[in-house]
From Swiss-Prot:
One of its GO terms (biological process) is ATP synthesis coupled electron transport. Gene3D superfamilies: 1.10.287.3510. Its EC number is 7.1.1.2. It is found in: Mitochondrion inner membrane. GO terms for molecular function: NADH dehydrogenase (ubiquinone) activity. Core subunit of respiratory chain NADH dehydrogenase (Complex I) which is composed of 45 different subunits. Keywords: Electron transport, Membrane, Mitochondrion, Mitochondrion inner membrane, NAD, Respiratory chain, Translocase, Transmembrane, Transmembrane helix, Transport, Ubiquinone. This is NADH-ubiquinone oxidoreductase chain 4L. Belongs to the complex I subunit 4L family. Core subunit of the mitochondrial membrane respiratory chain NADH dehydrogenase (Complex I) which catalyzes electron transfer from NADH through the respiratory chain, using ubiquinone as an electron acceptor. Part of the enzyme membrane arm which is embedded in the lipid bilayer and involved in proton translocation. GO terms for cellular component: mitochondrial inner membrane; respiratory chain complex I.
Amino acid sequence: MMPISLSLTMAFSLALAGTLIYRSHLMSTLLCLEGMMLSLFILMAMLISHFHMFSMSMAPLILLVFSACEAGIGLALLVKISANYGNDYVQNLNLLKC
C-alpha cells in the first residue's frame, strides 16, 4: 500500500477510534466525524485519480457536500442542546422526551 494511502487509512482509523472513545461530549464526536469525512474525501480523490476513473470524478465533491451538510446540522444541534441543557454531554440527553 502506498505510504500516503496508508497514512490516510490510519487517519480514518484514529478518527473512528476517537469517535468511539470520546463520545461523552458532542463537540468531540463532531470533530472526529469531520476527520473521518476529510480522510475519506482525500482517499477517494486519490484513488479516482490513480485508477483513472474519470466517470466517478464527482463522487468526492458529493461526499464533501454531504460532509458540509452534516457539519451544519451537527453545529446547529450542538448550539440548541447547549442552549437548552447548558452543556454538551451526550449521556445527559434523553432523546425519548418531548
